[in-house]
Amino acid sequence: MDAEYTVLYFWDPECGHCKKTTPKLETLYQEKFKDRNVEIFSVGKAVGEDFEKWKKFIRDNNMTFINVAVTDNLYNEAQDNSNGQEKLMKLLQTTTLASLNYQNTYDIFSTPKVFVLDKDKKIIAKSISISQLEEMIDRLQGKEELPKLFPPDPEEDAQMQKKE
């Protein structure tokens, strides 16, 4: 992704807070970010039976930004040594085993989680709410004067800071 800022959004189709946050993020993307060189890269939980729930959640929430998931199949195949590492080597051309296990690698033990990356893909913010995300991107792009779609919400801010 060649964007000035990239938002990483980690979510779970069964997460109650994700069901509230996702529509806000989609609105923010459509009404502010899409035309301002800000991309959203969404990583959903899609293991086991969650794969169908993941696809349905994307459809139901009209998620137009990039959506990916690591499935049980993909992770298990990457660890499988019986195929002479052929599949693993092909996969490692684009990713790592650590990134497939993103929950441990990136400390994602509760959802939703929002990270912001700069143009060099360095993390400049993590575990922020949608209102904090909007304020931050507006400020970074010198657009503080724009009306806010999502005013600060202390409950949402506290939820995004949770570790579990």
Residue ranges and their predicted role:
Residues V7-L8, V114:
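Hydrophobic beta-strand anchors of alpha/beta hydrolase catalytic cores
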Residues M1, D35, D107-S110:
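Extracellular/periplasmic catalytic domains that process cell-envelope and extracellular macromolecules
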Residues M1-T6, Q30-E31:
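A short beta-strand-turn-helix
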Residues K143-E164:
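Non-globular targeting/processing and membrane-anchoring segments
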Residues G16, N76-R139:
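Thiol/disulfide oxidoreductase modules built on the thioredoxin-like
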Residues K19-M63, V70-N81, T96-N101:
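Structural microenvironment flanking redox-active thiols in thiol-disulfide oxidoreductases
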Residues N67-V70, S127:
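Short acidic-hydrophobic, aromatic-tinged amphipathic segments that line or gate anion-handling sites
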Residues Y9-C15:
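Aromatic-flanked redox-active Cys/Sec active sites in thiol-based oxidoreductases
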